[in-house]
Amino acid sequence: MDGPAQQTDTVMAEAAAAQQPAPPSQPVAGIDNIPATLSHGGRFIQYNIFGNVFEVTAKYKPPIMPIGKGAYGIVCSALNSETNEHVATKKIANAFDNKIDAKRTLREIKLLRHMDHENIVAIRDIIPPPQREAFNDVYIAYELMDTDLHQIIRSNQGLSEEHCQYFLYQILRGLKYIHSANVLHRDLKPRNLLLNANCDLKICDFGLARVTSETDFMTEYVVTRWYRPPELLLNSSDYTAAIDVWSVGCIFMELMDRKPLFPGRDHVQQLRLLMELIGTPSEAEMEFLNENAKRYIRQLPLYRRQSFVEKFPHVNPAAIDLVEKMLTFDPRRRLTVEDALAHPYLTSLHDISDEPVCTTPFSFDFEQHALTEEQMKELIYREGLAFNPEYQHM
């Protein structure tokens, strides 16, 4: 898959360099010579990162560099001395303390192990614990990327339309594969779209993903508010792959306009912002909603649809046409990913022979029963052994 040749490396490299905090390929300033201590007979190495133990198998030799820290834990870049590949290793501390978070971790591991696509981030390793009975922290090594779309949008670096178009194409190309696996991502946003200096884009964070045929959807927080479609804002439980398409439309306009399209402070304002742009839906467009949702919309002020072309005069009219078809109120009338890829705006990139699908639908069967903490530990432990069979008898 070839991307835009013009200025690609320079623009992305400069954009990455301009960001705060440092992108994942850069060490955090001031962190040098992190001490390493061999443990468990030399089979593991312990590092002290921000006062936390970071313990990985001995193939991840020094130096190791912290590249991110969040509520989930710490991420470090490390070199796998066996494959000579740099990876981003995420430590999820006390991963089994919260059952919902543990299930998210298990779901992401199983999904990413199932998928194999250029535009979906790959898991390179799941590091087994030194002792099975003391298994509390989960370490997952992903392929290392340079930055994410959120950082690029927030940087002051200009991007050509060619770059934006190529990013959109890759998101849709990856999403076609995801949807063909019978999976909805459900949390697409700029932070979950990773980039490298070649403009390669990879979708990440599948912790909220779900099977498309599932009916009991509303058990967890789904889709960051700004990228949430009307059917979710109105509590429709019967949603489809169209939710991801809406999110992509919002992301693309944010990329073109360098600010969020619908930055709502809460559910109520979020719905108002999107209706101020796309207009109050007709009765026909509300057919899919329940009576309570219809009643709520009818009592709101009447909003007239704005002209996207007039509101965004700097955006290519062909791009506007595509976005308008992705941001339709009625999910049944929203473009599918395949339709979006075939849109005239993407003609220069679209190649159906190079847009693979997943041949085997993903099964969420492991979630059909209420898993205990110990069962989730065992399932993740087995995934680690699949990468590291030599640690079977530790």
Swiss-Prot record:
Boundaries of every Protein kinase domain copy: 61-346
Modification after translation: Activated by cold, wounding and UV-C in a cultivar-dependent manner; phosphorylated at Tyr-221 in cv. Subicho but not in cv. Pungchon.
Protein name: Mitogen-activated protein kinase 2
Start-end of Polar residues biased regions: 1-10
Essential cofactor(s): Mg(2+)
GO biological process: response to cold; response to UV-C; response to wounding
Note on domains (UniProt): The TXY motif contains the threonine and tyrosine residues whose phosphorylation activates the MAP kinases.
Name of the gene encoding the protein in the UniProt record: MK2
Regulation: Activated by threonine and tyrosine phosphorylation.
Ligand binding (ATP): I67, G68, K69, G70, A71, Y72, G73, I74, V75, K90
Tissue/organ expression: Expressed constitutively in roots, stems, flowers and fruits of the hot pepper (cv. Subicho).
Entry keywords, A to Z: ATP-binding, Kinase, Nucleotide-binding, Phosphoprotein, Serine/threonine-protein kinase, Stress response, Transferase
Residues covered by region (Disordered): 1-27
GO MF entries: ATP binding; MAP kinase activity; protein serine kinase activity
Pfam families hit by this protein: Pkinase
Annotated motif TXY, positions: 219-221
Cited function: Protein kinase involved in oxidative stress-mediated and innate immune MAP kinase signaling cascades.
Catalytic activity: L-seryl-[protein] + ATP = O-phospho-L-seryl-[protein] + ADP + H(+); L-threonyl-[protein] + ATP = O-phospho-L-threonyl-[protein] + ADP + H(+)
Phosphothreonine carried by residues: T219, T224
EC id: 2.7.11.24
Top-rank taxon, per record: Eukaryota
Family: Belongs to the protein kinase superfamily. CMGC Ser/Thr protein kinase family. MAP kinase subfamily.
InterPro entries in UniProt: Kinase-like_dom_sf, MAP_kinase, MAP_kinase_CS, Prot_kinase_dom, Ser/Thr_kinase_AS
Catalytic residues identified in the record: D187 (proton acceptor)
Positions bearing Phosphotyrosine: Y221
